[in-house]
Amino acid sequence: MSAPKKVVLAYSGGLDTSIILKWLQTEYGCEVVTFTADLGQGEELEPARKKAELLGIKPENIFIEDIREEFVRDFVFPMFRANAVYEGLYLLGTSIARPLISKRLVEIAEATGADAVSHGATGKGNDQVRFELSAYALNPDIKVIAPWREWDLTSRTKLLEFAEANQIPIAKDKRGEAPFSVDANLLHTSSEGKVLEDPAEMAPDYVYQRTVNPEDAPNEPEFIEITFEKGDAVAINGEAMSPATILTKLNEYGRKHGIGRLDFVENRFVGMKSRGIYEAPGGDILLEAHRGIEQITLDSGAGHLKDSIMPRYAELIYNGFWYSPEREMLQALIDESQKHVTGTVRVKLYKGSAKTVGRWSEHSLYSEAHVTFEEDAGAYDQKDAQGFIQLNALRLKLLAARNRRVK
């Protein structure tokens, strides 16, 4: 690969990407364009601009964009229509953000005449795969620079030494130490590294940044109502809101009640196991509510088929294949299933849990007349069950007879 002349860097303003910025300038001698995305991580982003300028980036080469609405509307909500969770637990908060960041990197590269993009993902993790598969899916000719796979800064200690030698400020956590490896957006916050690398050690409470300890949450439950239209949340307690505003509001409820904490050892796409602390307060509430409205609006056959493809759909997102044809095919099926997923769900929030306690819809398939234990006025003839059972039992009876005959 020929040396790039201009590179667009996914830049957070944090330690790793600031070091990468400096490294690109010195190692490649190239012009650097920075892209900083506001995905709802809750940080003031202007310091990233000032830090980039301090490191020699021209003002016209600094891109800071609020893409929260696009993130939730076009990435988070489609994923939640699928009830997607990786390995039964993880809400894919980091995974789902990477395709959008890659999309903007490629678009900015094309707009500024850059011939390469760069990211701060390590050579051990999943993010390198997600960034690069997404970039190549959108522009097959783009060059990608992954410093962690090239440089000799092979540990966090060497990284800190490089930062000190180049006068790059090093952030500290609230205990005065170098912070955990943290990723955050509107959907979640993840923390990895340091004491968390020992899966036997209980995560200290100070690791959790987004939620109160459930034991310290209010002693009284709170009830909220979430309204859905075609599988997407559109209102809370009757108040219509934009996608990003809905997730922001649900995060506030979840934070208050200690909802959405996960201590998880996952199987990375690259082959190793990794332990992380995840917090998705609004995501947990949204998933519970979406499942609640599907319970009365989704046909059983459609629902069971949808459940069967969910693990594959979640795996595709986790592994970085958002822009793959198979993900898009599954998305079309999932979206078709959501045509009647419209209605309202009441959710109880209490000390770390979000539980559906009521649901109603004009599109409901629930028939009280059929299911009642009381007189059903002829809605259902219980004698019909006899033939249903006999037909479904036929193959089992034939198998039993064969097994009795042939030992």
From Swiss-Prot:
Residues the record lists as binding ATP: 10-18, 37, 120
Which Gene3D superfamilies does this UniProt record tie to the protein?
Answer: Argininosuccinate synthetase, chain A, domain 2, HUPs, Single helix bin
Q: Per its UniProt record, what InterPro entries does this chain match?
A: Arginosuc_syn_C (IPR048268), Arginosuc_syn_N (IPR048267), Arginosuc_synth (IPR001518), Arginosuc_synth_CS (IPR018223), Arginosuc_synth_type_1_subfam (IPR023434), AS_cat/multimer_dom_body (IPR024074), Rossmann-like_a/b/a_fold (IPR014729)
The answer to whether UniProt assigns keyword Cell membrane to this entry is no
Its GO biological process annotations read:
argininosuccinate metabolic process; L-arginine biosynthetic process; urea cycle
Q: Which residues bind L-citrulline?
A: 90, 95, 126, 130, 181, 190, 266, 278
Into which family does the record put it?
A: Belongs to the argininosuccinate synthase family. Type 1 subfamily.
What is the protein name given in its UniProt record?
Argininosuccinate synthase
Q: Which gene encodes it?
A: argG
